[in-house]
């Protein structure tokens, strides 16, 4: 609570870094919030950036998040990039004096998490990591069953999650494989 600050103007000026599927999901939601204004969008993949600009044509486009962070007209950022970019962007955003909302996971390594934690503690900004399943009824019920002892000691777990589509996405040319399908590669997804 002590880190919460009153915004000095009528609307929170938000920038999105990463405008793929999750970034566009956030754009749709932000457009429904009267006290939020999307002022900038950033992506280094031109088709995603173009789609974001179609959704919010008044936003300033960027291809380099560092240039976006230099803007004094941005109060906070939403980070929806591949996981390997979370730590560097969060750290740079806090250093630039921006509030930060970042998609899960926080970072790839404990050292990166510690660096984020330390930097956040030195800032006066709000930092939040999106953990969408944490509040899902099924997960809450499962944790209640574990904590109550209803199912005994948990010694192992096997889980499957079925998506509506394959994780692999089509790529327009082979050199974009790792950029578009980053979730499938250890160096970018953990």
Regions flagged by a language model, labelled:
Residues 76, 82-83, 87-135, 149:
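Beta-strand-loop-alpha-helix segment that lines the small-molecule cofactor/substrate pocket
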Residues 60-64:
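Conserved SAM-binding strand-loop segment of SAM-dependent methyltransferases
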Residues 40, 76, 156:
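Short, Asp-centered acidic motifs that coordinate Mg2+ and/or phosphate
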């Amino acid at each position: 609570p002590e880190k919460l600050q009153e915004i000095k103007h009528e609307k929170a000026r938000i920038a999105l870094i990463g405008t793929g599927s999750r970034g566009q999901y956030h754009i749709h939601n932000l457009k429904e919030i009267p006290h939020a204004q999307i002022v900038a969008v950033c992506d280094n993949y031109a088709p995603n950036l173009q789609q974001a600009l179609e959704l919010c044509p008044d936003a300033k486009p960027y291809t380099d998040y560092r240039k976006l962070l230099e803007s004094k007209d941005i109060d906070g950022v939403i980070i929806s990039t591949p996981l390997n970019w979370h730590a560097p962007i969060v750290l740079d955003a806090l250093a630039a004096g921006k509030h930060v909302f970042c998609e899960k996971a926080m970072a790839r390594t404990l050292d990166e998490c510690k660096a984020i934690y330390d930097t956040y503690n030195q800032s006066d900004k709000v930092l939040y990591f999106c953990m969408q399943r944490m509040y899902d009824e099924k997960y809450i019920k499962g944790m209640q069953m574990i904590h109550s002892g209803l199912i005994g000691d948990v010694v192992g777990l096997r889980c499957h999650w079925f998506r509506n589509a394959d994780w692999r996405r089509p790529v327009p040319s082979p050199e974009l494989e790792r950029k578009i399908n980053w979730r499938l590669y250890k160096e970018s997804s953990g």
